[in-house]
From Swiss-Prot:
Subcellular location: Plastid, Chloroplast
UniProt GO MF annotations: RNA binding
Encoding gene (name): matK
Alphabetized UniProt keyword annotations: Chloroplast, mRNA processing, Plastid, RNA-binding, tRNA processing
Any Gene Ontology CC annotation: chloroplast
Protein name (database record): Maturase K
Main subcellular location of this protein, as a coarse class: plastid
Source superkingdom: Eukaryota
Any Pfam family hit: Intron_maturas2
Species lineage: Eukaryota, Viridiplantae, Streptophyta, Embryophyta, Tracheophyta
Organism: Matthiola incana
One BP term from GO: RNA splicing
Amino acid sequence: MXXXXGYLEFDGAQQQSFLYPLFFREYIYVLAYDHGLNRLNRNRSIFLENADYDKRYSSLIVKRLILRMSEQNRLITSTKDFSQNPFLGHTHLFYYQMISVLFAVIVEIPFSLRLGSSFEGKKLKKSYNLQSIHSIFPFLEDKLSHFNYVLDVLIPYPIHLEILVQTLRYRVKDASSLHFFRFCLYEYCSWKNFDIKKKSIFNPRFFLFLYNSHVCEYESIFFFLRKRSSHLRSTSYEVLFERIFFYGKIQHFFKVFVNNFPAILGLLKDPFIHYVRYRGKCILATKDTPLLMNKWKYYFVNLWQCYFSIWFQPQKANINQLYKANLEFLGYMSSLRLNPLVVRSQMLENSFLIDNVRIKLDSKIPISSIIGSLAKDKFCNVLGHPISKANWTDSSDSDILNRFVRICRNISHYYSGSSKKKILYRIKYILRLCCVKTLARKHKSTVRAFLKRLGSGLLEEFLTGEDQVLSLIFPRSFYASKRFFRVRIWYLDILYLNDLVNHE
């Protein structure tokens, strides 16, 4: 996004107010399609087989789209027109796909510029470790072991399009862009109810931006109250009303806030609260009593219903004890495990046995969901029995083998932090046997005959780089013992979710 700022002809103060003209400039389309903004998401997938519509991009199509956008009536196509002229309908569908990609780039410009200006004058250490999604696990291992309760909340989605438009209005001040944004959203809803071969008009990057904007709005209020909660007993609530007045909310919300929240916020004094958001859920952990968690739950319900006009079901916010609950987090099943320890103490001639309990965060692989994801991609059946990949038999033997080896190594690298490696080895076994069955099917042979002809050296390709390195680091006796299966290693070069997690 820093390179995109170099192409802009006006300063940062004006960019937030004049985003709409960027939709009519060809170089923005070049940046959106040729600058790697979408290429990264395509290349990191290990299951992707077909190219998307990005390859259909051309300068001629861009010029036609800009010409049509200058007259918005030409972009409106009813479902009746689509039935009468399918070619016209698919053409307009492709235009909306291009606009969605452009939206995802343009609307991020004010955010990236604001973020860059906030970092000016500050010395920040650039490290990929800070970007790794697995860096949260060492933090949870250090913090969650001291907590008692966790509030697991499913973040509600806006049910009306105007809520999304109003949320974005606080960030983007360009009225023309907001009107165009509202127009495209309503056109999307009219197309969504019609059969377009189950393809979405807008790309995931655009919807991810809308979702993050919605969540960022509620989190800004939550973090504000969380920061002020430890001072609420000794300070007045005027600062809270200033915050509400800043957002210009209606009088009804003032009454609800005055009647409900003062009593709630008076009991929110707890400096030991940690907040984590992940895939439509937020986790709130504390070491206090369940009363505090009920207060926060009641606060979330009132916040979404009164502030955002979103109906929220209280049963979607569950309060659980960490010792009894399993948290689905980044593809892992995390829970607290009590490890009993017996310590022998010698004092003069007397010895004592002291029973101690060590609390440890245990991260496991959800084998059922992983097998379900493998079954969706035709690597095995629903019971976990490997099957051959019929659509890969047209490739060469080396391509088939390299595909399976890459998938196996990515899974091993991602789930290296599991405390039970036997589940990971079961997944590897499914992929190995699926690879052998695919090659045997290609050569019209049985699995036994194919392995007998090539030998066991074929399966040695699946030995991951982690296994090779760890065999050199740890002693051979430890590497072959059962203790090695409980060694957890978090790699801080993982920036994205594994595809098996995305397919859940």
